[in-house]
């Protein structure tokens, strides 16, 4: 008898799979999906697994996620790897992010006996860390084999207050920057002999801190330049600093590029000595609301939950961005995310069961 989606999740939660440890989860998953072929790619201690089954000559649809979790830390009221069940909730590190999604994908795939094309499950043990040798590497491998999926559904925890209220059809990009304003150190009593970088940047700071680089649109919030750190000087009240360093991040839409951010700052900082470094971390992407996968998942959520989901691009980055970079139409749909990475992380059993039904509807 096949285990239920809840039983699968309980088992997954007992594995202490802190990035990049896989802890034997892949063997367990393979035992649940008989009849699926396997492709395994391991690099630098990171394990990746693709299980696939060809039902017909149609499109390749992939369900994807990660089995690694962040460290639990101290202060839990339960064993973070004990999979304790209390009052309709399962507790454990990864309950929401994202072993609930993994369990739902496994359980759904185990129940499907017909599909017009190929179905696959892609799992990685490197998403919560650098994500350098995880999904991205696996997709490169699949591209070399001519086996990239046409469509992907990533079961990250996307819901905000109630399961199904939000699905992700894109993500903002992330750009990190470092700006150093160069001055000349000196005694505060002799300002004519100093060049104070604080005074140089002060009139321009309001056009950097919290500045909206675009107006946003239906799917993306404005691309905001957010200062995360400012420091300079030697903690002496009578010495002006030689340099002032500003660190910043921009979570940006498809309307604003790294080049445009760089051009804006160069224009703003004309006339003062500075050094600027811009480093893109991830690119933004948007899957069309008219794409088959967005329509399928949206309609599935509406049938199961009775409410049409909001299409969002908010939140941080996820492995969905890698699918988009390889030209795969991707959407994210998962449980409520109110306790991800938090103490006493938990997930409602009803949400996990509903997610499985959504996947079955979307793939049916």
From Swiss-Prot:
Reaction(s) catalysed by this chain's protein: N-succinyl-(2S,6S)-2,6-diaminopimelate + H2O = (2S,6S)-2,6-diaminopimelate + succinate
Residues binding Zn(2+) 1: 66, 97, 156
Gene Ontology biological process: diaminopimelate biosynthetic process; L-arginine biosynthetic process; lysine biosynthetic process via diaminopimelate
Binding site for Zn(2+) 2: 97, 128, 341
Broadest EC class assigned to this enzyme: hydrolase
PROSITE patterns listed in its UniProt record: ARGE_DAPE_CPG2_2 (PS00759)
Pathway given in the UniProt record: Amino-acid biosynthesis; L-lysine biosynthesis via DAP pathway; LL-2,6-diaminopimelate from (S)-tetrahydrodipicolinate (succinylase route): step 3/3
EC number: 3.5.1.18
Top-rank taxon, per record: Bacteria
Recorded GO MF terms: acetylornithine deacetylase activity; metal ion binding; succinyl-diaminopimelate desuccinylase activity
Family matches, as Pfam families: M20_dimer, Peptidase_M20
Cofactor, free-text remark: Binds 2 Zn(2+) or Co(2+) ions per subunit.
List of catalytic residues: 68, 127
Cofactor(s) listed: Zn(2+); Co(2+)
Assigned keywords, A-Z: Amino-acid biosynthesis, Cobalt, Diaminopimelate biosynthesis, Hydrolase, Lysine biosynthesis, Metal-binding, Zinc
HAMAP family attached to this UniProt entry: DapE
Subunit structure, interactors included: Homodimer.
UniProt similarity note: Belongs to the peptidase M20A family. DapE subfamily.
Reported function: Catalyzes the hydrolysis of N-succinyl-L,L-diaminopimelic acid (SDAP), forming succinate and LL-2,6-diaminopimelate (DAP), an intermediate involved in the bacterial biosynthesis of lysine and meso-diaminopimelic acid, an essential component of bacterial cell walls.
Protein name, UniProt field: Succinyl-diaminopimelate desuccinylase
Organism: Wolinella succinogenes (strain ATCC 29543 / DSM 1740 / CCUG 13145 / JCM 31913 / LMG 7466 / NCTC 11488 / FDC 602W)
